[in-house]
Design a protein with these regions (language model features):
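Intrinsically disordered, low-complexity terminal/linker regions enriched in Pro/Ser/Gly
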Residues: 1-5, 149-158
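Solvent-exposed edge beta-strands and adjacent loop segments
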Residues: 2-79, 112, 116-139, 146-147
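Short, acidic/charged, Gly/Pro-enriched secondary-structure junctions
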Residues: 82-113
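Short intrinsically disordered coil segments
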Residues: 83-89, 133-135, 153-158
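Short, surface-exposed polybasic-and-hydrophobic patches located at secondary-structure transitions
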Residues: 141-144, 158
Length: 158
């Protein structure tokens, strides 16, 4: 283990160089207001009872996706989308595309496209009479995703 390759510090990816775009009803928006974002996928599974074993197995039966982020409170894109639903009953799923690339890292670029996105709730109005900046927490779900660009495998991974 003493001679095992180690990751170079510069290969850690800085999140400050990320890009995030949202496409709603054919309109693509640069969501530069987001300063924190995370998406995850969870495997749904069912218990499998097996005769002759004391343990219970698991069988994958599907998956679900969720996302969350924090943004500066200075855009109305999602509120307009939600208002359309409130007035018409039509909620159009949207796409969120996130790319990570740090020019100082040899990891390169990774892009994840989330499709079938919905928002769980929306802040409609907000103020704070203090001197703090306004922000908003966003969260929702997605039902599809793709990875059109992948990080390069770092030297020593194989």
């Amino acid at each position: 283990m003493l001679n095992a390759p180690v990751m170079e510090a510069n290969d850690a990816v800085s999140g400050s160089m990320a890009e995030c775009y949202v496409t709603i009803d054919g309109n693509r928006y640069n969501m530069m207001q987001l300063y924190s974002f995370e998406s995850s996928a969870k495997v749904n599974s069912q218990d499998v009872k097996i005769l002759g074993r004391t343990g219970i197995g698991k069988k994958p039966t599907g998956w679900s996706g969720s996302w969350k982020g924090t943004a500066h409170f200075n855009q109305s894109v999602f509120r307009r989308w939600f208002l359309t639903y409130c007035k018409t009953g039509k909620m159009t799923p949207f796409e969120i595309q996130v790319s990570n690339e740090d020019p100082s890292s040899s990891a390169g670029r990774q892009t994840i496209s989330h499709t079938g996105c919905l928002i769980d709730s929306s802040i409609l109005a907000k103020f704070d009479a203090g001197d703090s900046l306004l922000d908003e927490e966003l969260s929702g779900t997605f039902d599809g995703w793709d990875m059109p660009e992948e990080f390069t495998e770092l030297s020593g991974m194989e």
